[in-house]
């Protein structure tokens, strides 16, 4: 059986991602055929607010050479544009990002169930990745991990989750959201933007079964 999401056609399949339309446009209505609990993902207005606040904090942090605001900005951007699980985020290293290929991607070495997969990146996010990698290399060159603490050590899952809670507070958003909501948000917008292509969502999120995606 021919797979809906074939690797040969990935460039065309991800045109919508390249245009960065996932979070720029508000959906025409709030109905999703894919059943998702609305308390578990951010709508486009909340995404816009969160990104704006964190981008401003990041720009200030870069000038003052502070790691935490810049790291938190990239944490949220990565979650929104890749849908990675929190354990996948904390284990991500600089060499796992492939930004010189025609279609940029990142490699998840050990995802859920110890499975590996490739996640494709929108062109606009590639620029953000390059910016963060270059800045981190200048600031903490000794660590390959993308998410590090002030001492340069690998950040834990718990620490990343706490950082996200602080991001919510900074943006004035409801505190009930967990960092996993970034994954739900990515999946929801990807589903809408891909004309309800569940197979594509399954591939990107790394679900072993399409029933999990549903």
Segments from the language model and where they lie:
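Conserved catalytic core of the tyrosine transesterase superfamily
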Residues: 1-214
């Amino acid at each position: 059986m021919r797979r809906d999401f074939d690797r040969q056609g990935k460039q065309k399949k991800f045109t919508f991602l390249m245009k960065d339309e996932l979070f720029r446009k508000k959906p025409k209505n709030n109905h999703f055929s894919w059943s998702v609990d609305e308390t578990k993902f951010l709508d486009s207005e909340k995404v816009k607010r969160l990104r704006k606040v964190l981008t401003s904090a990041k720009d200030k942090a870069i000038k003052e050479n502070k790691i935490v605001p810049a790291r938190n900005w990239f944490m949220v951007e990565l979650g929104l544009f890749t849908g990675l699980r929190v354990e996948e985020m904390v284990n991500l290293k600089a060499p796992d990002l492939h930004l010189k290929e025609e279609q940029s991607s990142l490699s998840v070495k050990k995802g859920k169930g110890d499975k590996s997969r490739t996640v494709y990146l929108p062109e606009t996010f590639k620029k953000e990745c390059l910016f963060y990698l270059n800045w981190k290399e200048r600031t903490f060159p000794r660590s390959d991990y993308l998410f590090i603490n002030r001492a340069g050590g690998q950040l834990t899952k718990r620490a990343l989750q706490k950082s996200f809670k602080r991001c919510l507070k900074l943006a004035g958003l409801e505190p009930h959201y967990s960092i996993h909501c970034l994954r739900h948000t990515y999946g929801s917008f990807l589903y809408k933007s891909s004309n309800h292509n569940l197979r594509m969502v399954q591939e990107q999120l790394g679900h072993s079964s399409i029933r999990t995606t549903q």
